[in-house]
């Protein structure tokens, strides 16, 4: 932007000298909503003459933005060979260029050029002072009642949902493992705490009682 401001001092308005046309422009314009109107005022009578008015972009005027060609008695031809959306209108000692759909990176200095094509002699203007067109970005304010969620918000929602599902699966798996482990410990504990049982009383087999014999009595 500083370079463009310095350019205004490098290209002062040129006064009419013999076969030159004086062209004046506004020093600076701001393009709101990506559109701007630039008027090129000249001090030359173009009535009944065929002329060509063009708008150029850059300090070296390398880009021809828009062209208005014709005369007062015929319909003007307006065109752009560089992709700009432009229109033109011929007024009283002025040509107005209407530029639309401008981009922020098209902020630059623009120069008007007026040429008398017919009848001879050919006339044009010295380089004018130029106009800096500052294209401001279009900011859309969200509705306060129904604000539209931004893309990062949905990304966070999706990531949060995935993490929640993962946490739920891990929790369920842990609970299942814990229940099974607890059941296994209980079964093992019951087995270890079982007291050994003594075998039941066995039935004793008694010999039938027989009184002892006194063999001495038999001897006597």
From Swiss-Prot:
The modification Phosphotyrosine is found at residues 191, 209. The modification Phosphoserine is found at residue 189. Residues 180-220 are cytoplasmic. Its main location: membrane. Residues 28-137 form the Ig-like V-type domain. The keyword Phosphoprotein applies. GO terms for cellular component: cell surface; cytosol; external side of plasma membrane; immunological synapse; plasma membrane; protein complex involved in cell adhesion. Receptor that plays a role in T-cell activation, proliferation, survival and the maintenance of immune homeostasis. Functions not only as an amplifier of TCR signals but delivers unique signals that control intracellular biochemical events that alter the gene expression program of T-cells. Stimulation upon engagement of its cognate ligands CD80 or CD86 increases proliferation and expression of various cytokines in particular IL2 production in both CD4(+) and CD8(+) T-cell subsets. This is T-cell-specific surface glycoprotein CD28. The lineage of its organism: Eukaryota, Metazoa, Chordata, Craniata, Vertebrata. The gene is CD28.
């Amino acid at each position: 932007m500083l370079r463009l401001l310095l350019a205004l001092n490098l290209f002062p308005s040129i006064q009419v000298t013999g076969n030159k046309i004086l062209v004046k422009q506004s020093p600076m314009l701001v393009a709101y909503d990506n559109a701007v109107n630039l008027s090129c005022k000249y001090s030359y009578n173009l009535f009944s003459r065929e002329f060509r008015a063009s708008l150029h972009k850059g300090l070296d005027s390398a880009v021809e933005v828009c062209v208005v060609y014709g005369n007062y008695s015929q319909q003007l031809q307006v065109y752009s060979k560089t992709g700009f959306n432009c229109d033109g209108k011929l007024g009283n000692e002025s040509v107005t260029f209407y530029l639309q759909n401008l981009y922020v990176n098209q902020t630059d200095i623009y120069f008007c050029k007026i040429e008398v094509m017919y009848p001879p002699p050919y006339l044009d203007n010295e380089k004018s002072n130029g106009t800096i067109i500052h294209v401001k970005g279009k900011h859309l304010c969200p509705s306060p009642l129904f604000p539209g969620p931004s893309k990062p918000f949905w990304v966070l929602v999706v990531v949060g949902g995935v993490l929640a599902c993962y946490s739920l699966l891990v929790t369920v798996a842990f609970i299942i493992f814990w229940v099974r482990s607890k059941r296994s410990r209980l079964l093992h504990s019951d087995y270890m705490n079982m007291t050994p049982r003594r075998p039941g009383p066995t039935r004793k087999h008694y010999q039938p009682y027989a009184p002892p014999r006194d063999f001495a009595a038999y001897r006597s």
